Amino acid sequence: NNNPILISLILSKKVLGKYLYYTPRGPLLKKTANREEAYAFYLTEIKKYLKAKNAILFKFDPLIEYIKHDKEGNTTTEDNNQQFVDFLKKNGAKHRGFTIGYTDEAQFRWSYALDIKNRTFEDLTKDMNSRCKRSIKKAEKYPLMVKDVTDKTIKDFKDIMESTAERQHHGDRTLSYYQTLKCQLKDIIRMCLVYLDKEKFIDDINRGKYSIDEKVLDIIKNDERIMIPISAGIFIFDKNRFNYVYGGTYAEYFSLMAPY
């Protein structure tokens, strides 16, 4: 009846005459659909497609919650989706485990969710650990400013993301990718830059408002820009969620706690 219950974005990459295929955070499924039935059909059909396309690998990472944890990483329930993991294995999939930290995988296996409905900023900070509270307080004392990325400043954004990717040993997107992201998602995306007001910062230092490492101070003084971009982030609205997708910061400015 032309009423789709499952959708899937499939990306391909040619390697030595063969193809690698990847479905990022998918496939996506309607809540009313029978999950195992829909996935069984999808996997059967995708195998036929991949065989015809001379594929050597198909990777997918469904956006399906496995089990809930508290902020310390401890499980809060015994209910999990292991049955579905086993179902996928029976259908030929290989699970790479619940890895932690930076890996060669495109998507992280862990995500942090914060319920902000009917809660003030003061309410939220009560649940934060002491380190996070200190970082926010420290960032607030510096002359930092958040601005949306424009066509003129998107290169600054890209430079920060590239520097972060190199430091963390993972790949980065191209400038054209970020430009397309900004253009196509429009009202549901925020691409932000955090700037340091150089003149105000140096004036504060001279007045003894706070101190800073001499090497960092020299870097700031030698930068010819009045507003220095030091941190960046991408945020996407998704119905009732505001997702922090990814971000970056120049290593030399870590002490300013700009992401906070």
Predicted features, each with a name:
Residues 1-17, 65-72, 92-107, 111-255:
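A conserved beta-strand-loop-helix scaffold within acyl/acetyltransferase catalytic domains
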Residues 18-104, 225, 239-260:
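Acyl-donor binding region in acyl/amide transferases
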